[in-house]
């Protein structure tokens, strides 16, 4: 069921991205934003590279945060973290009670993903989680007409669009994700690089 709620200009959003894949444990960083204007906090945890613990770790990180009760939405940079550690967005929504918006710069190449998953003994399980995330929709945010691609859990399309437009201030990628990416790569690599 999709949550229907009024989107306030200072809606509290948690954007989560992962760091560079340098070790067996991969850092994930969450930034708590009020709308797209300012950051209220930073969360950090670790997941297993190519593991299956991303959903559980995110749930724990969110529920144990002092920001949990203020948050209204979770934003993810895709559904695979730390290599092929797939996030079950339906479970993340169910366990945290927070709607989930997945943002992608480009539409995933499912043939390549399916092929890569053949190298995992539990590739079919991962594939089911990927397919369970639902339909990928194209959205033009108004920033240079550049499209982004989204998936969602627990939130309607109109609210997704409102939230993305509200938070996409400097690029087509919402600020909570853009800043989470900068922090995660900066901490891991010594300097931020790449695109969220």
UniProtKB/Swiss-Prot annotation:
Q: Which Pfam families match?
A: DUF99 (PF01949)
Matching InterPro entries, A to Z? Endo_dU
Entries under HAMAP family matching the protein = UPF0215
Q: Which family does it belong to?
A: Belongs to the UPF0215 family.
- Please give the name of this protein: UPF0215 protein MM_1007
